[in-house]
Every structure is written in C-alpha cells, then in structure tokens.
Swiss-Prot record:
GO terms for molecular function: ATP binding; ATP-dependent NAD(P)H-hydrate dehydratase activity. It catalyses: (6S)-NADHX + ATP = ADP + phosphate + NADH + H(+); (6S)-NADPHX + ATP = ADP + phosphate + NADPH + H(+). Pfam families: Carb_kinase. This is ATP-dependent (S)-NAD(P)H-hydrate dehydratase. Keywords: ATP-binding, Lyase, NAD, NADP, Nucleotide-binding, Phosphoprotein. HAMAP family: NADHX_dehydratase. The keyword Transcription regulation does not apply. Its EC number is 4.2.1.93. Belongs to the NnrD/CARKD family. ATP binds at residues 230-234, 251-260.
Amino acid sequence: MVLKLFLSKRPIFLHPHCVSSSCRNSDTTIRLSRRIATMSENKSPLLERARNIVPHLETHRHKGQAGRIGIVGGSLEYTGAPYFAAISALKVGADLVHVFCLQAAAQVIKSYSPELIVHPLLDSNDATMQIEPWLERLHVLVIGPGLGRDRLILQTVSELIKICRQLQKPLVIDADGLFLITHDISLVKDYYGVILTPNAIEFCRLFGNDRDRIMQTLEKLGRGVTVIEKGLNDRIYDSLTLEKYECPQGGSGRRCGGQGDLLAGALATFYFWALECKQEISPAVVACFAASYLTKNCNTYAFKAKGRSMTCTDMIEQIHNVFDDIFEHKKE
C-alpha cells in the first residue's frame, strides 16, 4: 500500500549548521520554470525536504565540504557508465569525485573529463590495500557502474563493501553491484546506510515477482537498507520504517542508456547533503526522491531539445537548468 505523504505537525530537527547556513527556511518560495509545469505543481513534502538539503554556496566554505564522492566501476567494455555517474555527481554539486576502475578503463575515463580523479586499482594484486586509505576520505561511495562481472573483480568489491561496513560508509549500489548483491545478500544485510537502485529486471532478481511480499523480503535485509525501484513511477522502500513512497511520473518515452548512472551519481551527492542536514524523514529517502526528480526532469528537458536523438550526454547537459529551476536557492 502506497502511503500518502503529508506534512507532519511535529518539529523537524535540523543539523545546527544547516539551520544557520546550509538549509533554507521551509517557507522559502521557489519559482519553477514553466517547462516543467506539470511536475512543478506537485506539492510533495519530500520535494520541499529535498530543496532544504541543498547547501548554500558561501565564500567561507572550502573544497570538499559539498561532498567527496567515490565511484567503484569501469572496465574494458564499460567506460561510459562510471563517467556518467561521476560527472553527474560533480554537476549536481559535489566538490570532488574519485573513480576506482580497472587499468584498461583508466585512460579512457581520464580522457572524458579532466575534473575526475581516476585510480586504476581494481585489478591490481593488492587492490583493497591500495583503495582502503581513500575510502576514509570519501563521504559516499557508488558501487557498480561499468563494473563488469569478472569473478576476481567482484571478490575485490565484496572485500571493499566489508571494509565500508566497518567504516560505516554510506553506499549507493547500482548495476553490476546489484548483480553481486543478488548472489550474496549478506554483504548488505543489516548494513545501515545502503541504498540499492534496481531497475525492473534487477528488482525482480532481488525480490522476485510477488509484490505483496516485497516488504517482508526488504525486512529480511535488516533495518537501514533503502531501495529505489526505477520505473515509470520510481518507488522508494524504506526498510527502517517499512514504508513505501512513490515519486511522480515524468520524463519522456526515450529511455537512453546511462540514465541510471546519472541517477546513481546524483543520488550520491544528494545523500551526503541529506546526511549532513538531518530531517525527520530518512536522509536516504529524501536523497532518492531528489535524485529521481532531477533525473526525470533532465530527461524531459533533453527530450524537448533533442527528441528521439537524445542521449545521456544531453541529459547531463540539462542538470544545471533542472537544478536551477527546482532545487536552487532563490533570492527574494
């Protein structure tokens, strides 16, 4: 049963820094572009909370405060996915993004963008030992874009997830990272702070086809695992409260490759912001809603400009416009 969201009369407890500088007042009026009139009419309290987590751009802030994100993925065959995730995290507003990939993918990913910090370590003999020191510096890790399914690489990633659990590191697991989880669910069981981002096929692999038993299966994962099921209407499942939220419909009929990578990268940035700016609704839920809403509108904007020829690169180019229309702080 989908829960209808409502504004709680209880006070919302915010992080002290958010109250003073990072979060806007709840009564701030946001004027949205007419290009998204249909979606802008949505009055979901989750959208308001998503706006509230966006930090103000202030001169006293230093590099890294808006987010240091890690992407684990990138193989010989798949170099685009980690790039899409990484550049999306940056364009949403993260300060630094590190990509941990196979050696064969490193030069290609570096050539896509000089803004990315690329580490060709995943297939090295001592991969976990070399990557572990970097993990402590990162705020959120995205595991899976372009990872591939090589057995030895998946074993390395399994070890990295175990290290992240010890560090209590927030994770976003996507694509081939979900393939790994499907075969070893214990990696995320009772791991507070994990977000899974399956599409329809990946969702069935994880939870089966019986939708009436989704919450029971989710409960078995343990408290603290959040799932966003990507589809016509993205659905967010919160295992902490066993509640389900539905994101508004949006986008276009064009489903280009890489859209899920855009969402994963954007989600990582939003997730860090939400964790820094605590609200009464789960930070993971708020971040999932924000990433879904942004991605669907990027699709809408890009399709209006490019139509059937639209690609993920066109969607990424629209992140600025969508963010400015929906999430950005406006001066009165």
